[in-house]
Amino acid sequence: HVDKKVADKVLLLKQLRIMRLLTRL
């Protein structure tokens, strides 16, 4: 199964990606 820490890291990376896309608009 996926480790909680890894899942949290992936979530953070996704959020950062979305933030960057939003700031670009």
From Swiss-Prot:
Keywords, ordered alphabetically: Antibiotic, Antimicrobial, Fungicide, Secreted
BP-aspect Gene Ontology terms: defense response to bacterium; defense response to fungus; killing of cells of another organism
Induction: By bacterial infection.
Transmembrane feature ranges: none
GO cellular component terms listed in the entry, alphabetical order: extracellular region
Subcellular location: Secreted
Function summary: Active against Gram-positive bacteria B.megaterium and M.luteus, Gram-negative bacteria E.coli SBS363 and D22, K.pneumoniae, S.typhimurium and P.aeruginosa, yeast C.albicans and filamentous fungi F.culmorum, N.crassa, N.hematococca and T.viridae. Inactive against Gram-positive bacteria B.subtilis, S.pyogenes, B.thuringiensis and S.aureus, Gram-negative bacteria E.cloacae and E.carotovora and filamentous fungus B.bassiana.
Protein name: Spinigerin
Organism listed in the record: Pseudacanthotermes spiniger
